[in-house]
Amino acid sequence: MAVGKNKRTSKGKKGGKKKVTDVFTKKEWYDLKAPKMFLVRNFGKTLVTKTIGKKLATDGLKGRIYEVNLADLNNDEDQAHKKIKLCCDHIINKDCYTDFCGLSITRDKLCSLIRKGYTLIEGYTDVKTIDNYQLRMFCIAFTKKRPNQTKTTCYAQTSQIKKIRKKMVDIMNAEASKVMLKDLVKKFIPESIGKEVEKQCKKIYPLQNVLIRKVKILKRPKLDISKLMELHTDSKEDAGKNVKSLPESKEATNILSAELKH
């Protein structure tokens, strides 16, 4: 005889069915604000658990990192191959104020650049900006054919690769060490550093597709809320512009002159 539970004698479960509760009733939405170096300032929303007792909702938001496509931040599809990381540093009411936290290019873009018959050259260096941000920058470049070249391949020699890599490191150090982080981010968007590398390395070996492949933030200074809010407020130049006075219509002047006569 098989040993098992007798269905007749077994008792039913206590409590019955559990109540189905909606998880989203315990959560709330916050707006995400991007720094003024980008065109789109409100780039999305984020979800967090509401404040319960000593556990504050803001504590769950601070330090969150959001990866956003640069095409969405600048309304430009030509920049869709770049991804920007923004870190939430400060919360006011329902607004999360973010700061730049890193950059990278998409895998699709990187795979489309790597081709047979060309030399890939990559260099990286650790730099420090004026406002004490320590970054690690990675630069990538590819050789290209010289004018009137009949040879199908264009491989660079080891000595040429070393010279190009040294130039890369020198240019990245020079460009980053003289500016603040916000000014450096403005250089990343139009690839001005990559163009400078391409220009200076032309004599060594002609290059193409020179990009800042990745930017990591190794160390950040202590949070200064006043400096963070400067990144999110518009400059005084726009606020101080004079508005041109509109010309008065003839009907308005006639009415005023008639009232003065009476």
Curated annotation (Swiss-Prot):
It comes from the Eukaryota. It holds the Pfam family Ribosomal_S3Ae. GO terms for molecular function: structural constituent of ribosome. One of its GO terms (biological process) is translation. The keyword Ribosomal protein applies. Its main location: cytoplasm. SMART domains: Ribosomal_S3Ae. GO terms for cellular component: cytosolic small ribosomal subunit. Keywords: Cytoplasm, Ribonucleoprotein, Ribosomal protein. HAMAP family: Ribosomal_eS1_euk. Belongs to the eukaryotic ribosomal protein eS1 family. Component of the small ribosomal subunit. Mature ribosomes consist of a small (40S) and a large (60S) subunit. The 40S subunit contains about 33 different proteins and 1 molecule of RNA (18S). The 60S subunit contains about 49 different proteins and 3 molecules of RNA (25S, 5.8S and 5S). This is Small ribosomal subunit protein eS1. It comes from Plasmodium vivax (strain Salvador I).
